Amino acid sequence: MKTIRQVSVHGGHSKEYCLHAEDLLEDIIKKYIQEGFAWVGITEHCPPLNDDLRYPDEIKAGISKKYIEKRFKKYICQVNEFKKKYSSEIKIFLGFETESYDGYIDYTKELIKTHKPDYIVGSVHHINNICFDFSRQLYGKAIKSSGDINQMYEDYFDKQYELITSLQPAVIGHFDLIRIFDTEYIKRIEKRDIRKKIVRNLKACKKNNLILDFNTRALKKKAKEPYISRSILRKAKELGVRVAPGDDSHGIMDIGTDIKTGVKILTRAGFNTDWPVPDIYTCPAQ
């Protein structure tokens, strides 16, 4: 029987660099090694563009953009150190996770130019500059900003398409995160206008040879299935889009648990379990 390598294309959030995470980054890496992972992408959130666009927990804690930038520089240095320190035990990729608020394209290119990651995870957490996935309250606020929930889905996938085509990130994070607080998402993603945008985005991922993060953190949050939803996953398989597991770990307890369920789902869906390794990000910063 074939042994399937454990990998995570999106993970490694730690309390040193993310207020809503737990545990030290080095302990998290040691846990990946203990669990037998072949490789992992350490992909912390990038700093905010300005103080107004900090995460709600960062605003509450009173930490500034300047502080977060300084902390991010330390993160980059530390991951590069750990890449060397643990090179005989695990392959570590240095990455970071993008945002999607106004001005993010040029800002992300500048971050890439400055910090030289191995790759980035392109994620959409904001609709109309509202961090919709942080709480039900903010999700509701994002719906109002779009007009209704169906339009919010369309706005989300339009923003994701913009991200895909402008930055070509090696990995697309939690493709359908927009469903996070929507109990009717299974029906909603089949609506014609929304579905057209989903398929358009999948085709763009295929064209640019991007990898979809099969994000199992959704299971930890008691969702019915990982991001990507089953019907979208089937379409990705049909189109030949590359997919790899991502635990989106925010602490030691997230490592080596739900990702096994994700691997089983991908195996049953017929995906190649010789997991694709992300291409090093090559989009020029202009």
What are these regions (language model features)?
Residues 1-102, 106-107, 181-182, 188-192, ...:
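An N-terminally biased module of ancient metal coordination in phosphate/nucleic-acid-related enzymes
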Residues 22-25, 189-198, 225-234, 260-261:
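Charged helix-capping and loop-helix junction motifs
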Residues 32, 120, 174, 212, ...:
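Conserved, mostly hydrophobic/aromatic
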Residues 33, 113, 164-165, 237, ...:
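Non-catalytic positions within long, well-ordered alpha-helices that form the structural scaffold/packing
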Residues 40-42, 120, 172, 212, ...:
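Hydrophobic residues within beta-strands of alpha/beta enzymes
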Residues 54, 61-205:
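Extended substrate/RNA-proximal surfaces in nucleic-acid metabolism proteins
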Residues 214, 222-245, 257-260:
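Extended hydrophobic/aromatic segments used for targeting, binding, or gating
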Residues 254-286:
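Mid-to-C-terminal alpha-helical segments outside catalytic/metal-binding sites
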